[in-house]
C-alpha cells in the first residue's frame, strides 16, 4: 500500500496485505512508479481489500487487529507464485496474476472477512498484485504491453512465502499507514 509519513489524517478505511520482498518488490514498485510517479505504494497482495470498520474508533481497530491475529493462527505460511501481467476488463486495472497459492488466498480471505472486518466488497475477491490503475482507457493496452515487457526481463524468483500480513489504515491523502504486522500460524518445512 502507499507508505505514510504519519502526518496525514487517518480515516475509516482498513485493509490486510502481504508486502512482497526483495528484488521482486523492487521491480514491481518500479513498474508501478512508471505509471504513477507520485505513488508511495509498496508491492503487495491484498488479502482483505479496503473496507470501513463498523463503529469506527481506536478501540474498534484494536479489536479488529486482535480478531485477525487469532484467526491467522489457523493458517500456516504458504508459498505464492506470481504469473502473467493481465488486465481486469471492467476496471482496466493492470495486475500480476497469482499462479500458485490462489486457492489459499481465497480461503484466507473467506475466513477473515468476518466479525469486525466483515464487508460486502464491490467485486468478487481475486488475489493479484496491482501494477497500474486509473489510466485513461486508450492508454491501458500500451501500458499493459510495457508492463509485460518489463516483467519478462525479470530473471529472479517470482515466488514468495506468505508468513505475515500487515493491517493498514488509509488517510484522507490516500496514503496507507502500517498498523500491525500479524504472523500466520506454525511454519511448515520449506
Please annotate each region the language model reported.
Residues 1-79, 87, 101-156, 164, ...:
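Basic, often amphipathic N-terminal segments
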Residues 86-93:
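Short, basic/glycine-rich phosphate-binding loops at helix/coil junctions
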Residues 169-171:
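Short, exposed beta-strand-loop hairpins at the edges of beta-sheets
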Amino acid at each position: 500500500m502507499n507508505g505514510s509519513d504519519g502526518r496525514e489524517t487517518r480515516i475509516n478505511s482498513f485493509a490486510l496485505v502481504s508486502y512482497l520482498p526483495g528484488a521482486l518488490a523492487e521491480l514491481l514498485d518500479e513498474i508501478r512508479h512508471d505509471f504513477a510517479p507520485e505513488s508511495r505504494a509498496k508491492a503487495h497482495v491484498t488479502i482483505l481489500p479496503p473496507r470501513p470498520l463498523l463503529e469506527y474508533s481506536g478501540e474498534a481497530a484494536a479489536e479488529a487487529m486482535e480478531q485477525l491475529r487469532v484467526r491467522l493462527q489457523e493458517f500456516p505460511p504458504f508459498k505464492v507464485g506470481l504469473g502473467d501481467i493481465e488486465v481486469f476488463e471492467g476496471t482496466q486495472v493492470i495486475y500480476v496474476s497469482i499462479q500458485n497459492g490462489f486457492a489459499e488466498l481465497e480461503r484466507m480471505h473467506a475466513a477473515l472477512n468476518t466479525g469486525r472486518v466483515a464487508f460486502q466488497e464491490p467485486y468478487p475477491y481475486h488475489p493479484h498484485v496491482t501494477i497500474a490503475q486509473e489510466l485513461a482507457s486508450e492508454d491501458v493496452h500500451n501500458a499493459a504491453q510495457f508492463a509485460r515487457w518489463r516483467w519478462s526481463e525479470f530473471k529472479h524468483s517470482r515466488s514468495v512465502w506468505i508468513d505475515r500480513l500487515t493491517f493498514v489504515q488509509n488517510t484522507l491523502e490516500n496514503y496507507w499507514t502500517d498498523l500491525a504486522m500479524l504472523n500466520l500460524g506454525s511454519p511448515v518445512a520449506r
